[in-house]
């Protein structure tokens, strides 16, 4: 599920997670009603937005933060308000809205100096280009972003630019170039820098090395991610619930490693560990990965009916909006039935998948040619 890789690693905890969000939000709203229109009020609005980041209230409060910050000529909170709008629309893949808020955010950041947030926002925009298969545009914009970050000596922007380059290269099947860009991002990480950025880069490395079947490096990065996560949660225990998706990711990819090294029982223990982090609020992509790893596990122990049933679950989830991933899952299901000895069923699935892939490949080839002509 290569397109899924592009989404699952981008926004790990860019806003702080909260447990008991309804209680925390209600409490802060009561405080907000008593505050004068000053910086304290802006700070409280900012905290409320962090809690409400996953629903439409985020936009309502971000609008309020923007209006009040502009009245007070507070460029810091105006920049943050623009960033929260961007994050909300990025998570919903609304490319035009992201572009609109990038334009609004940049002049505010030039005054506030919040360049880390601006480069995060640019990363959202460029990764959406990649997600919508505008690979040459993504590469061009990532290189512009890298140069701007180098010009102002912003490490986070440089790291993010290399991550964007990696996504675009991998999305267009240039795996070696993608891994090289990602390893450069990893090399540039400050030793005691932002843990969330470290987690994001490591998660990409884990996803890519797994796809490239590089078990040695995958295990190395899994162990490092586990250590970074452990230290982060020890230092920030209240944020553990907000990082549940990262724990799911880590356990699922440990399971992949152990399945790839013929250790299914250890793999199963990690799948079971991932289950305890699943909730109704778990991000869609992680739910797909969760069912997919169960399919892989049951295939490894030759329980083909159960393996196929889990693939069916992922197909239902992917069919509407993720055509190429849907085709990839059909191919996985075909391989399951080949192993099970049901060649007729496998052939039908192969034909369905290849028809989708041929259509997608032709469209992608035409799109890339047009992008190259324009560049």
Q: What does each of the following model-derived ranges do?
A:
Residues 43-55, 80-94, 120-133, 157-173, ...:
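Tandem amphipathic alpha-helical repeat scaffolds
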Residues 20-43, 56-60, 96, 219, ...:
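Hydrophobic positions within repeat-based interaction scaffolds
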Residues 149-229, 239:
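Solenoidal tandem-repeat scaffolds enriched in leucines and small polar residues
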Residues 29-33, 63-70, 103-113, 143-150, ...:
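Amphipathic alpha-helical segments of tetratricopeptide repeats
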Residues 36-117:
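Post-signal peptide N-terminal segment of secreted/secretory-pathway proteins
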Residues 39, 76, 116, 156, ...:
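Residue signature of alpha-solenoid helical repeat architecture, marking inter-repeat boundaries
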Residues 1-32, 39, 49, 84, ...:
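Bacterial Sec-dependent N-terminal signal peptides
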């Amino acid at each position: 599920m290569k397109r899924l890789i592009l989404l699952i690693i981008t926004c790990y905890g860019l806003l702080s997670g909260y447990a008991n969000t309804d209680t925390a939000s209600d409490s802060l709203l009561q405080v907000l009603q008593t505050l004068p229109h000053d910086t304290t009020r802006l700070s409280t609005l900012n905290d409320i937005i962090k809690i409400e980041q996953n629903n439409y209230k985020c936009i309502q409060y971000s609008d309020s933060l923007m209006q009040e910050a502009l009245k007070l000529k507070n460029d810091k909170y105006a920049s943050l308000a623009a960033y929260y709008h961007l994050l909300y629309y990025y998570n919903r893949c609304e490319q035009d809205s992201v572009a609109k808020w990038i334009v609004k955010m940049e002049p505010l950041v030039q005054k506030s100096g919040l360049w880390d947030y601006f480069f995060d926002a640019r990363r959202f925009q460029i990764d959406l280009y990649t997600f919508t298969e505008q690979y040459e545009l993504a590469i061009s914009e990532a290189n512009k972003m890298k140069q701007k970050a180098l010009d102002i000596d912003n490490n986070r922007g440089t790291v993010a630019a290399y991550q964007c380059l990696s996504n675009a290269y991998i999305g267009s099947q240039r795996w070696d170039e993608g891994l090289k860009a990602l390893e450069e991002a990893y090399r540039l990480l400050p030793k005691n820098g932002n843990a969330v950025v470290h987690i994001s880069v490591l998660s990409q490395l884990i996803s890519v090395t797994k796809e490239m079947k590089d078990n040695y490096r995958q295990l190395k990065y899994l162990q490092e991610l586990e250590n970074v996560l452990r230290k982060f949660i020890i230092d920030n225990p209240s944020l553990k619930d907000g990082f549940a998706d990262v724990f799911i990711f880590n356990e699922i990819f440990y399971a992949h490693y152990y399945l790839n090294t013929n250790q299914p029982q250890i793999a199963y223990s990690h799948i079971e560990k991932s289950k305890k982090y699943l909730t109704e609020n778990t991000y869609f992509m992680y739910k797909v990965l969760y069912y997919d790893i169960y399919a892989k596990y049951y295939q490894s122990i030759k329980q083909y009916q159960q393996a196929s049933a889990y693939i069916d679950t992922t197909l239902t989830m992917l069919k509407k909006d993720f055509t190429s991933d849907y085709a990839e899952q059909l191919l996985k299901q075909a391989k399951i039935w080949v192993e099970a000895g049901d060649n007729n069923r496998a052939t039908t699935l192969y034909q369905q998948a290849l028809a989708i892939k041929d259509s997608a490949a032709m469209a992608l080839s035409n799109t890339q040619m047009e992008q190259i002509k324009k560049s």
